[in-house]
Regions:
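Alpha-helical transmembrane bundle of multi-pass membrane proteins
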Residues: 6-258
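AAA+ P-loop ATPase catalytic core
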Residues: 2
């Protein structure tokens, strides 16, 4: 099987120099559209907030009402375990069972619901994360626990949706002749946005008076980008599960709205 695949790749790329690959990537409309899809997937996924939640999980749990260093580390560890189990289950079972596009839409929906809830909670307690001396009222304790639970829900949604699809789409969409170049570009954009998001979020969480957009504004921003991503996926991403390379080429020969 490996030898057959290698032979097919060698045959597909035979006689294609660097300039030929670049021209085929950017001058063939169906290939350029695939580049657009993978680039948008990388941008929308990284700025949906899930990556920064993982990076800054202890601080964000404290922001939502977790008190104490040990408690913060514990809920962060549980979050990591949930994301690991969800990623394995989604990658090995759910994505192929329910289809790429449906999995992506369900995951984005879960993530959007989570972000909207967290943003709404932070809006109801605007001093959270802004005033260091602020104490969460007793009547907001239940809402705080709900926001913490929504972090876990967003982790599952991320594993089912963007986390799986941003890599699968990049690997599956392109013909063999241009796959190496296009995958390299997509992954470069992926890590550039991941780095940019990780650097931006601490500044976004700052109070408006010090140049940030507040915690509530940060999560409303994540919610908006996640919802925009869901709408974009609905109209732009085709179902690619079970398609051969030949049928993939025929799929992208159609107009985008089909």
């Amino acid at each position: 099987m490996i030898q057959t695949t290698h032979a097919a790749e060698m045959e597909a790329t035979m006689g294609s120099g660097a300039m030929g690959v670049i021209k085929e990537t950017f001058l063939v409309p169906s290939n350029l559209y695939r580049v657009y899809l993978t680039f948008m997937a990388q941008i929308l996924s990284q700025w949906s907030g899930a990556g920064s939640i993982t990076v800054y999980a202890p601080d964000l749990f404290k922001l939502l009402g977790v008190t104490g260093e040990n408690e913060s580390l514990l809920v962060t560890a549980v979050f990591g375990i949930i994301k690991l189990i969800a990623a394995i289950l989604c990658a090995l079972f759910l994505v192929d069972v329910i289809g790429r596009k449906r999995a992506l839409l369900i995951g984005i929906t879960l993530q959007a619901i989570s972000m909207v809830y967290i943003a709404g909670f932070l809006t109801s307690v605007p001093a959270m994360g802004v005033d260091e001396n602020y104490t969460l009222p007793a009547d907001k304790k239940g809402a705080s626990e709900g926001a913490i639970a929504m972090i876990y829900v967003s982790g599952f949604g991320w594993a089912l949706g963007w986390n799986s699809m941003q890599y699968l789409l990049t690997a599956e969409l392109f013909p063999l002749r241009i796959r190496a170049l296009c995958t390299s570009m997509a992954m470069t954009l992926h890590f550039a946005n991941q780095y940019g998001n990780a650097r931006a979020v601490p500044n976004m969480l700052l109070p408006v008076a010090t140049g940030g957009i507040d915690p509530k504004g940060t999560f409303w921003c994540f919610a908006a980008i996640t919802i925009i991503g869901g709408v974009w996926v609905w109209f732009s991403i085709p179902e690619t599960a079970g398609r051969s390379l030949e049928s993939m080429d025929r799929l992208f020969a159609l107009p985008w709205y089909k």
